[in-house]
Amino acid sequence: MSYQPQTEAATSRFLNVEEAGKTLRIHFNDCGQGDETVVLLHGSGPGATGWANFSRNIDPLVEAGYRVILLDCPGWGKSDSVVNSGSRSDLNARILKSVVDQLDIAKIHLLGNSMGGHSSVAFTLKWPERVGKLVLMGGGTGGMSLFTPMPTEGIKRLNQLYRQPTIENLKLMMDIFVFDTSDLTDALFEARLNNMLSRRDHLENFVKSLEANPKQFPDFGPRLAEIKAQTLIVWGRNDRFVPMDAGLRLLSGIAGSELHIFRDCGHWAQWEHADAFNQLVLNFLARP
């Protein structure tokens, strides 16, 4: 039987998660039926979702025999909105823990982009026995850069878009999000804008969260040596959101890690270089 591509609608699921005395309705997509599970965690951009972030990576993983879970973190996509005054990544890690517990999944491989990478590190530090392998793209440490003034140009534009969610500000952010802007079609802009504006509560609560705690993503650098999982670090040479030296910091701190840098690539390696990225990840996951 020929492979049937996954669809967002057919794989859409919801679970209730208890967090800080409240019940949050959390959305995720559940794809494939493999013995090993790969969880994909998206970044923090306005309008981001698990499906939108990894649309070019889902089918190759499922075809290779993996079960794939795409989480909409609280405050994004179809999940409930929150005002968060603590560590955003620790919150995401707790939510993910509850989801995989309810799904009765003992161990997961984690693949995270930007905020998703930072949240993957948070999960691994808290529950190392639940993690197989780690793939960290354009995020994972927090902290300062040795070479780039912080906040970066990209983060400034991201925060501006949250405060003023217009098509003009979306294009300003996306223009430096990727290296080659020729793939940024009007249809992509329209879909992302619709995602943003359909959940204004997410936008407003992200701004409120920043006001409550400007440091949503703490510096995990001093604890990286605790990570024992085999780790693939992936960066874009031209990333203007999270500087490349953050990847070097991960490489230095995590003993069982390796770093792959894509040239002519911005903050979205899994999308900009999808074919090469997918093969890189599949080879990494298949290794003993």
Curated annotation (Swiss-Prot):
Changing N113A: 200-fold decrease in catalytic activity and almost 2-fold increase in affinity. The active site is at H267. Changing W268G: 10-fold and 20-fold decrease in catalytic activity and affinity, respectively. InterPro entries: AB_hydrolase_1, AB_hydrolase_fold, Epox_hydrolase-like, MhpC_alpha/beta_hydrolase. Pathway: Aromatic compound metabolism; 3-phenylpropanoate degradation. Gene3D superfamilies: alpha/beta hydrolase. One of its GO terms (molecular function) is 2-hydroxy-6-oxonona-2,4,7-trienedioate hydrolase activity. Coiled coil: none annotated. It is an enzyme of class 3 (hydrolase). GO terms for biological process: 3-(3-hydroxy)phenylpropionate catabolic process; 3-phenylpropionate catabolic process. Keywords: Aromatic hydrocarbons catabolism, Hydrolase. It catalyses: (2Z,4E)-2-hydroxy-6-oxonona-2,4-dienedioate + H2O = (2Z)-2-hydroxypenta-2,4-dienoate + succinate + H(+); (2Z,4E,7E)-2-hydroxy-6-oxonona-2,4,7-trienedioate + H2O = (2Z)-2-hydroxypenta-2,4-dienoate + fumarate + H(+). Changing H118A: More than 2-fold decrease in catalytic efficiency and 3-fold increase affinity. HAMAP family: MhpC. PANTHER family: ALPHA_BETA-HYDROLASES SUPERFAMILY PROTEIN (PTHR43689:SF8), HYDROLASE (PTHR43689). MhpC is not a serine hydrolase (catalytic triad), as Ser-114 is a non-nucleophilic catalytic residue and Asp-239 is not involved in the catalytic mechanism. Belongs to the AB hydrolase superfamily. MhpC family. Homodimer. This is 2-hydroxy-6-oxononadienedioate/2-hydroxy-6-oxononatrienedioate hydrolase. It comes from Escherichia coli (strain K12).
